[in-house]
């Protein structure tokens, strides 16, 4: 499905590669910013090619603030970081992603982590996420939920309490629900809590088309490479007057992002 309504991290692709100097996507295409989830090439090369990146490390274990400061100073002033909120906010401790957590949790902390619970460890995780965003001068934070975070009255109530109580600091907060969530329920949550709905546009349709955030994970998995026709379909569906992000998160993310930049320019 590709519709938009009617209107430094280590790459998973293996060793860092060099980009063709004739390839560049460092301009903002209309109001759409294009990049990858993590760096697939050396950071200096990436900055000459793209205008933004989605930071993955903050989800697993936020780096030291001094490390984030270095990332910020090494990139151009107008380069944009978006980042994923720490998993302690969204994912229960039984999630396999906790294998990359670099701290030992007590049994109490394990029971109180994740699912937007009103607990000390979730509040601490939000504070760490907010601190990372401040250092990176990030304007957008993504809350990615696992498919185990079901559409229940309890989970919705937890979300409402969390987002109504935190210090948002005028940040653009984005939510990526996974699993079987009803579109009208998602729309209601996003409107009432002022959230941007995050989707893979080849799988679902965003309920917040005026400010979209697309994450392309590969139609049949991470190793998938998008065909030119698929990227053209997405490019023509975007309304350039609207603001949004398109991040590639597949094995060929850098190449696909570059192809998409060119197609969007031509659309």
Please give the residue ranges for each predicted region.
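Residues lining hydrophobic/aromatic ligand-binding pockets adjacent to catalytic sites
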Residues: 2-5, 11, 16-267
């Amino acid at each position: 499905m590709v519709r938009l309504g009617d209107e430094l991290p280590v790459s998973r692709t293996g060793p860092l590669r060099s980009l063709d100097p004739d390839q560049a996507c460092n301009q903002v295409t209309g109001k759409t910013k294009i990049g990858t989830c993590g760096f697939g090439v050396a950071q200096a090369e990436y900055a000459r090619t793209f205008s933004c990146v989605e930071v993955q490390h903050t989800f697993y274990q936020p780096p030291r603030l001094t490390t984030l400061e270095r990332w910020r100073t090494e990139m151009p002033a107008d380069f944009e970081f978006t980042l994923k909120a720490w998993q302690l906010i969204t994912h229960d401790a039984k999630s396999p992603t906790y294998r990359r957590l670099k701290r030992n949790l007590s049994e109490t902390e394990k029971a109180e982590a994740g699912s937007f619970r009103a607990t000390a460890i979730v509040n601490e995780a939000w504070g760490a996420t907010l601190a990372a965003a401040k250092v990176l001068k990030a304007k957008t934070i993504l809350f990615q939920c696992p498919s185990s975070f079901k559409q229940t009255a309890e989970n919705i109530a937890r979300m409402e309490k969390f987002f109504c109580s935190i210090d948002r600091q005028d940040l653009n907060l984005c939510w990526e629900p996974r699993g079987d969530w009803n579109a009208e329920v998602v729309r209601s949550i996003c409107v009432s809590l002022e959230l941007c709905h995050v989707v893979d546009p080849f799988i679902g349709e965003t309920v917040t088309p005026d400010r979209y955030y697309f994450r392309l994970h590969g139609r049949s998995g991470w190793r998938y490479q998008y065909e030119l026709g698929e990227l053209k379909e997405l490019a023509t569906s975007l309304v350039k007057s609207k603001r949004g992000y398109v991040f590639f998160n597949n094995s060929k993310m850098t190449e696909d992002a570059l192809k998409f930049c060119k197609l969007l320019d031509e659309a």
